Structures are given as structure tokens and as C-alpha cells.
Amino acid sequence: MNIDISNLKVQCMGEIANVKNLKELEEFQIKYLGKKGIVKNMLKELSTLPSDKRAQAGRQLNELRDFIESQINELRKKFEEEEKQKRIQKERIDVTIPGKRVEVGAIHILSQVQKEISEIFLSMGYEIAEGPEVELDYYNFEALNIPADHPARDTQDTFYISDDVLLRTHTSPVQIRVMKSKKPPIKIISPGRVYRSDEVDATHSPIFHQIEGLFVDKGVTMADLKGTLEVFAKRFFGEETRVRFRPHHFPFTEPSAEVDISCIFCGGKGCKTCKGEGWIEILGAGMVHRKVLANCDIDPDEYTGFAFGMGVERIALLKYEIEDIRLFYENDLRFLKQFR
């Protein structure tokens, strides 16, 4: 071993005094303490020394290694603290700078209305059921007693993905799925998005929202349906609201009716909104058709039921006197902020 250990220590002290940052410190550590470093190589050469000098040289090398490690550790702490302080200064927040106003979001008006409608029916013992928006023709049409030649199946009215797959045109398929998977009594509402091939205008949109209801049990009558919808109308539109049923036709209910409420703007006296009639249509309803019950393996001689369906957008338009359905979808904050 030809290197003088005492001189090597002086050399180390001189070099480490010139180390200015963590990168240079890493290079210094590798040079002296790395696998191929100076100290490591000197330790390997100890075996070449005479036995009477080997112990002393080994002790001196260990002391040198410990000294270098202590110097490295002290410098590392120093440099890390310096970098930390630099980072703190760089990221420092000036609390005297005026803050930026954070815009607080709110629930969309359609979500508010859907929730309000749902909560009324939930309070009457209904449960919420959901289903896929991409639906099979069977659940959307066939099981609901809508034959192949029915106008509703026209490609001009329905978004078909393939011959038997489509975007649901109503949330009624949820009712079929529930009736096929559950035995009566069944008492559900099914809110959700639906799709129809309509031109966009003030009252139509190809995507809109519905809430449909279904109650199936023994002894359910039209009187139960009328009472249920009267409760809903009075709670949602006000206690003075009156309800009337007009005969109509739906393939999935028999008898069927369109349901009107007394005009909430003129009290039934006649105005521009109700076109002078004093009544405004809000939904369709009826007794579940025997064939629909049979399609779901429910005995129509033992069970009866009623169903109803309403458009959330239509209800919102009426309640808030909004004239154009497109306002719901344009994300204009000037409009949406009115319903916080």
C-alpha cells in the first residue's frame, strides 16, 4: 500500500470543502466510498501488508471512512435544508394578495325537479328502479304490447343501434325488467334519460328525462291511480290544484288516460299558457294491460296494476314558467343561476 492515509485525509478535507451541492456530494461519495472508490480499494490492499502493519492500517482506514461518512452526512443535511428553504420560498403564498372568488356549483334545475318528484312518490312507499339506456327491442316494445307494425317502432322515431338493440324511448322497460324479476306487490318509479328522434325546437329534444311509476298488487283500481296522482299534483303544484282524466289510448295500458291539472297560472279561468282552456296536460297513465302482465308471468286474473309516466322537462317548464326546453341544455349560467 503506497498511499499515505494521513495525506489522503487532508486530500479529502480539501475536496469536500469545495463541494457546493447534492450532486457534487454524490460524486465525492462515489469517488471515496463507492464500490470502486479509493477507500474500498485500499481496504482490499490490506492483505498485501506485513502482519505487523496490517492492523494499524486497517484501523486508520476505518477511521478515515467514518470521518468521510460523517462529513458527507453533515453536508447532505445542510444541502437538503437549503433546497427545502428554496422550495418554500418559491412556493410561498402571499396572503396579502386579494383572493380569487371560487365559483360555487349547484344542482341542475332538471335534477332538482326530478328529485322533488321522486321524493313525493318515495313518501308514498314507492322505490326507485333503474335500467339500461341501451335497450333490447323486446323490453322497449314487444313486452309492452307494442306490435311490430306500431308507429312507435318507426326508425324515424327511434334510434336503432341494430335490428333488436336501440336507445330506449321511455323508461317503461325498467317496469318490465322489475316485473320479470320480482313478484307482486310491486311499487316503483323509474327516472332516467330517454331518446327519441325528434327535431330540436322549443318543446322537443332528442334526449330528455322521464319518470314512470308502476303499482301492481291484488285489487289495484283506477281509483287508486286517480288518488295517487291527485296527491302528487297537490304536493308538487299546490293544494288548490285539481286533476282530471281524459280517455286516451296507450298500447300498454287499458283503460288509458291523459291527465290534466287545473292551470297553475290562471287557476283554471283560461290564459295564454293553457290556451284558454283552464287545463294543462302533465302526464299519461292507465291500468296495466293484461297482456303486459302476462308477458311478465304475472296472472292478470289475480293481479292488477296501474302505470303512469311524465316528462321531467315538461313539469319543470310548467312549474318555472320556462318557454324553451333548449335552455335546460345550453349551460348558460345566467339561466342556471336563477335556480340555485
Curated annotation (Swiss-Prot):
InterPro entries: aa-tRNA-synth_II, aa-tRNA-synth_II/BPL/LPL, Phe-tRNA-synth_IIc_asu, Phe-tRNA_ligase_II_N, Phe_tRNA_ligase_alpha1_bac, Phenylalanyl-tRNA_Synthase, tRNA-bd_arm. Tetramer of two alpha and two beta subunits. One of its GO terms (molecular function) is catalytic activity, acting on a protein. Mg(2+) binds at E254. Binds 2 magnesium ions per tetramer. Belongs to the class-II aminoacyl-tRNA synthetase family. Phe-tRNA synthetase alpha subunit type 1 subfamily. It catalyses: tRNA(Phe) + L-phenylalanine + ATP = L-phenylalanyl-tRNA(Phe) + AMP + diphosphate + H(+). The lineage of its organism: Bacteria, Bacillati, Bacillota, Bacillota incertae sedis, Caldicellulosiruptorales. It is found in: Cytoplasm. Disulfide bonds: none annotated. This is Phenylalanine--tRNA ligase alpha subunit. GO terms for cellular component: cytoplasm. One of its GO terms (biological process) is phenylalanyl-tRNA aminoacylation. It is an enzyme of class 6 (ligase). Its cofactor is Mg(2+).
